[in-house]
Amino acid sequence: MGDIDMTLMHEFAVRTRYGSEVLERRELVLDAHLRYLRRFRTRIRFSGPILDLNGVTPIGGFTIFRATDLRDAQSFVENEPFYRAGILESVELNGFLGFDANVQESLDTAASAGLFLCQQSIKSLWHGNGVANPDGLVTSGLTLDGEFRRATRLVRIVRALDSAEARRSIIPTWPQEGREPRGASIVRWRFGRAITSPA
C-alpha cells in the first residue's frame, strides 16, 4: 500500500474479533499494531477497539479505511500485526459507503459519553428507521458486498451514556429492554490511540 492518488480509492470496513485467552499475546503485539496503523493513518478514517460490556476489555476491533480495491484492502488486513500473530478469531471485510463524519466534535465530547458501534442487517430495516438524536451521531454508512453493488448492513457510530440510550437514539422503535432485532448489534467502541495521537 504505497503512496497513490487518494481520490482513486474506495472505503472498506473491517470488523475483527479476538480469539479466547489471547489478551496477554495481544499486549505483546499491541505496539506493533499501533505503529502499523500510524503508518497508514492518512488512509484510516476511524479505527479503534470493540470493548466488552463493561467498556474495559478489548474483544475485537473496527476500522474504516481506504484502499484501491479489494485486493489492496485484503493486503492491509493480512499484514496487520494482530492478523499475522494469529490473535484474530474472525475477520469480516466489506466495502463501505460513508454518509457523514463528525469525528472532531465526537473526540472533544468523548469524555462525557461513551461511543457505540451499531450495526443492522439491511434485511431487517423497516420504514421509519432514523436517528432520534443526530447530535450523538459520529458517522454512518453502509457495508457493501465484494463487488460494491449491494448494501449488506447499516453501520452507525454514536455517542451515548449507555447502550440503552444508543439503541433509542439510533432506532427509536427498538425496544428499550431485551434483545435487539434479528441481524442487529450494539457494542461499545472507542477511538484508537494510533488515530487520536500524534504520529
Which ranges hold each PLM region?
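Conserved, structured core segments of small domains
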Residues: 2-199
